[in-house]
Amino acid sequence: MNYNIILVIALVIVALSMLGMLARVIIGPSLADRVVALDAMGIQLMAIVALFSIFLGTKYMMVAILLIGILAFLGTAVFAKYMDKGKVIEHDNNDRH
């Protein structure tokens, strides 16, 4: 069996699963569900870029995969802090002179 057909089928499956995660982001019901769905969409986007890189036969898209992973991690960390504290950046005015 041709590997290109398998790659295209894998791309379609990951794209369809991304649509399911998009529905979870829109519907919710809670903020935690939306955060987990966005994180899963980041991982699925990394998989799509990796499969597309294999399909094209190039290794130069690996930097994009790393950047997507870093941004997904930072986004999840920021949302977790927002859910915990209610704000992302805390200002402590007592330390200023």
Swiss-Prot record:
Stored InterPro entries: MrpF/PhaF-like
Transmembrane segments: 3-23, 35-55, 60-80
Primary location: membrane
Keyword Transmembrane: yes
GO molecular function: sodium:proton antiporter activity
Any matching Pfam family: MrpF_PhaF
Membrane topology: Multi-pass membrane protein
Record flagged with keyword Transport: yes
Keywords: Antiport, Cell membrane, Hydrogen ion transport, Ion transport, Membrane, Sodium, Sodium transport, Transmembrane, Transmembrane helix, Transport
Subcellular location: Cell membrane
Gene Ontology terms: cellular component: plasma membrane
Entry's family note: Belongs to the CPA3 antiporters (TC 2.A.63) subunit F family.
Quaternary structure and partners: May form a heterooligomeric complex that consists of seven subunits: mnhA1, mnhB1, mnhC1, mnhD1, mnhE1, mnhF1 and mnhG1.
Protein's job: Mnh complex is a Na(+)/H(+) antiporter involved in Na(+) excretion.
Protein name stated in the entry: Na(+)/H(+) antiporter subunit F1
Organism field: Staphylococcus saprophyticus subsp. saprophyticus (strain ATCC 15305 / DSM 20229 / NCIMB 8711 / NCTC 7292 / S-41)
